[in-house]
């Protein structure tokens, strides 16, 4: 293989897209005043890129839910962006979930990310799966509903095939958009996308992209998500524990390489896990041709 020609081909394929790329961004509710400032600075910076939507994660308890609701409403009011709250079936009855969904609809929210949610230790209630939540949302209003997918298999799934069948159930229940867990093995994502097509899943499988600025934090996240960390990725961050600037450059380089290959493979929608930071996501979007 002529690697120089391949690199040129990747760069040329990006330039040929000419703005034919959609991006979306995920944020989470801040825990203190400093993080609150960082969140809104990031939202306003990334707002200029005209994302397809932005999503806000969600905790199981009512306080977290209220914070998510408040952020989503403020995003919509201040920026005009389509804001999608995460919603889970944990720690809320079906009637409560219907009321939450109705409140969102009445507030002008038209998109929801529907998840089962992580069951806390000692949780004994009957599971309310994402498929059930999608059906419930469909019974309330005509939401655009995003659900999660796992190219490297959900940690609780019995098998890769069982996990894929579960995704198909969520689509059949009424979901019309899929966002994947973050990953670093692009080939694994592409094979997963092919298997989705073979099973009759005909919605866009949007890759979740995580620019890694904190490798230690990534290790903790990978343990609970079943995401494989390649050895080459570990080596990239060796010796950088106290060098945030270089870590940022490494993170941007890795993510940019991923989106170049994915775009060459026909991917036109990308979902960025921003961790409430805008700098790297903004730079990666610039490379993709997504600009103010």
UniProtKB/Swiss-Prot annotation:
InterPro entries: FAD-linked_oxidoreductase-like (IPR029041), Mehydrof_redctse-like (IPR003171), MTHF_reductase_bac (IPR004620). FAD binds at residues 58, 60, 86, 116-118, 130, 150, 154, 157, 163, 166, 169-170. Its cofactor is FAD. Its EC number is 1.5.1.54. Catalyzes the NADH-dependent reduction of 5,10-methylenetetrahydrofolate to 5-methyltetrahydrofolate. Is required to provide the methyl group necessary for methionine synthetase to convert homocysteine to methionine; the methyl group is given by 5-methyltetrahydrofolate. NCBIfam families: fadh2, PRK09432.1. Present in outer membrane vesicle formulations which are used as vaccines in human. This is 5,10-methylenetetrahydrofolate reductase. It comes from Neisseria meningitidis serogroup B (strain ATCC BAA-335 / MC58). The lineage of its organism: Bacteria, Pseudomonadati, Pseudomonadota, Betaproteobacteria, Neisseriales.
């Amino acid at each position: 293989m002529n690697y120089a020609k391949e690199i040129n081909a990747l760069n040329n394929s990006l330039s040929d897209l000419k703005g034919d790329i959609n991006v979306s961004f995920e944020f989470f509710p801040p825990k203190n005043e400093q993080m609150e400032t960082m969140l809104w600075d990031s939202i306003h910076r990334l707002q200029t890129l005209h994302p397809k939507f932005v999503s806000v994660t969600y905790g199981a308890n009512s306080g977290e839910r209220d914070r998510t609701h408040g952020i989503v409403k403020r995003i919509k009011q201040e920026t005009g962006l389509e804001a999608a709250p995460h919603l889970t079936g944990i720690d809320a009855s079906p009637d409560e979930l219907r009321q939450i969904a109705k409140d969102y609809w009445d507030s002008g929210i038209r998109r929801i990310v529907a998840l089962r949610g992580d069951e806390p230790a000692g949780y004994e209630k009957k599971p309310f799966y994402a498929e059930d939540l999608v059906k419930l949302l469909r019974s309330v209003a005509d939401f655009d509903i995003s659900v999660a997918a796992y190219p490297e298999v959900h940690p609780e799934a019995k098998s890769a095939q069982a996990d894929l069948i579960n995704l198909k159930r969520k689509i059949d229940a009424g979901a019309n958009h899929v966002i994947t867990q973050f990953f670093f093995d692009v080939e694994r994502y592409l094979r997963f996308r092919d298997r989705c097509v073979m099973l009759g899943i005909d919605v866009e499988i949007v890759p979740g992209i995580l620019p890694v600025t904190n490798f230690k934090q990534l290790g903790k996240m990978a343990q609970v998500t079943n995401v494989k960390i390649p050895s080459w990725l570990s080596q990239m961050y060796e010796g950088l524990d106290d060098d945030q600037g270089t870590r940022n450059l490494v993170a941007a380089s890795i993510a940019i390489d991923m989106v170049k290959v994915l775009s060459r493979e026909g991917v036109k929608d990308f979902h960025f896990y921003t961790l409430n930071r805008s700098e790297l996501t903004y730079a990666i979007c610039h490379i993709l041709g997504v600009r103010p």
